[in-house]
Amino acid sequence: MAVEALHCGLNPRGIDHSAHADGIKLQIEGEGVESQSIKNRTFQKVPDQKGTPKRLQGEAETAKSATVKLSKPVALWTQQDVCKWLKKHCPNQYQLYSESFKQHDITGRALLRLTDKKLERMGIAQENQRQHILQQVLQLKVREEVRNLQLLTQASVECSP
């Protein structure tokens, strides 16, 4: 899968951007959106009446008022970020275990290192619930690895002659 995520160039009137959203997870006004919803959209610089860049706009209507940014790496997540993830991906366990995650200072880096034994020591007694959480963590690891590979691919494309 070839990925060109974002290319920026500086010119006297502003910054030129070209973006391709294949397989990249984007943050749009705080909500995670898979790139499928904006696939094959072209974003371009639109000058205002004075000739200066006003904003990036695309064919997608959501791009009109949304700021688009890549989500931060899981290793940099705070406890709050982890609790948001837990609520979204483990809604049945969230009420039971969010306090335990806070007490044990589970940040993104710690989340990626969770094991069955660690979850058990945190008070998650039922094996099926531990397995569900670990399955979600595994999926998160896979998404993070894909993201890292895309960034590496992008960097190697930009550096090659």
From Swiss-Prot:
Gene from which the chain derives: Samd12
SMART domains xrefs: SAM
Transmembrane segments: none
Signal sequence segment: none
Protein name, UniProt field: Sterile alpha motif domain-containing protein 12
Pfam families cross-referenced by the UniProt entry: SAM_2
Renumbered residue ranges of the record's region Disordered: 44-64
Organism of provenance: Mus musculus (Mouse)
CDD domains attached to this UniProt entry: SAM_aveugle-like
